[in-house]
Amino acid sequence: MGVRNHRLLLLRHGETAWSTLGRHTGGTEVELTDTGRTQAELAGQLLGELELDDPIVICSPRRRTLDTAKLAGLTVNEVTGLLAEWDYGSYEGLTTPQIRESEPDWLVWTHGCPAGESVAQVNDRADSAVALALEHMSSRDVLFVSHGHFSRAVITRWVQLPLAEGSRFAMPTASIGICGFEHGVRQLAVLGLTGHPQPIAAG
């Protein structure tokens, strides 16, 4: 079996108090809520049903991702800042409506963040994450435990779209995305797989 027979899975961390409010959470350490902890456990049950092939688990260094991995019953093989969330810089802790009070058309996918990461920087980091996954996929499945925006960035670059198209993918808390190949073409096979109900976000 080779790289085209294996999968890249992405697991977003469970719910936090900031994620429920839509606050941009990059490097700030926030704990999972009780709901988030349950979500992580349910995600672990789902992963157990996916018949993964000797998966290597690579995790962001943030506490919320490490706790999600532990609650999901995963053994983390590598912790790396490569999978950290978008650095929101001056916008850390703010919601999109708050940011748009001063920059009406702002979208992280097209504008980036002052004093944080630009779109180009996240694009390059996502490409590096995809390359890392492909290195391991020659012999096994790969599971990234990461964050909402960065997981969407990886998915976008996996399917070789411009990073701005990441705005079109949803990644609810503790949800799973699965990337793979069909006839040699990189594809997104599954998105938003959860073991818990998720409301549809408005606007």
Curated annotation (Swiss-Prot):
<comment type="function">
    <text>Phosphatase with a broad specificity. Can dephosphorylate a variety of substrates including phosphorylated sugars like fructose-6-phosphate (F6P). Is able to function in vivo as a fructose-1,6-bisphosphatase (FBPase) and to maintain gluconeogenesis when the classical FBPase GlpX is absent. Shows negligible phosphoglycerate mutase activity. Has no phosphatase activity against 3-phosphoglycerate, 2,3-bisphosphoglycerate, or hydrophobic substrates such as alpha-napthyl phosphate.</text>
</comment>
<dbReference type="InterPro" id="IPR013078">
    <property type="entry name" value="His_Pase_superF_clade-1"/>
</dbReference>
<dbReference type="InterPro" id="IPR029033">
    <property type="entry name" value="His_PPase_superfam"/>
</dbReference>
<dbReference type="GO" id="GO:0042803">
    <property type="term" value="F:protein homodimerization activity"/>
</dbReference>
<dbReference type="GO" id="GO:0003993">
    <property type="term" value="F:acid phosphatase activity"/>
</dbReference>
<keyword id="KW-0378">Hydrolase</keyword>
<dbReference type="GO" id="GO:0070297">
    <property type="term" value="P:regulation of phosphorelay signal transduction system"/>
</dbReference>
<feature type="active site" description="Tele-phosphohistidine intermediate">
    <location>
        <position position="13"/>
    </location>
</feature>
<comment type="similarity">
    <text>Belongs to the phosphoglycerate mutase family.</text>
</comment>
<feature type="site" description="Transition state stabilizer">
    <location>
        <position position="147"/>
    </location>
</feature>
<keyword id="KW-0119">Carbohydrate metabolism</keyword>
<feature type="active site" description="Proton donor/acceptor">
    <location>
        <position position="85"/>
    </location>
</feature>
<dbReference type="GO" id="GO:0006094">
    <property type="term" value="P:gluconeogenesis"/>
</dbReference>
<comment type="pathway">
    <text>Carbohydrate biosynthesis; gluconeogenesis.</text>
</comment>
<protein>
    <recommendedName>
        <fullName>Acid phosphatase</fullName>
        <ecNumber>3.1.3.2</ecNumber>
        <ecNumber>3.1.3.11</ecNumber>
    </recommendedName>
</protein>
<dbReference type="InterPro" id="IPR050275">
    <property type="entry name" value="PGM_Phosphatase"/>
</dbReference>
<dbReference type="GO" id="GO:0101006">
    <property type="term" value="F:protein histidine phosphatase activity"/>
</dbReference>
<keyword id="KW-0312">Gluconeogenesis</keyword>
<dbReference type="GO" id="GO:0042132">
    <property type="term" value="F:fructose 1,6-bisphosphate 1-phosphatase activity"/>
</dbReference>
<comment type="subunit">
    <text>Homodimer.</text>
</comment>
<dbReference type="Pfam" id="PF00300">
    <property type="entry name" value="His_Phos_1"/>
</dbReference>
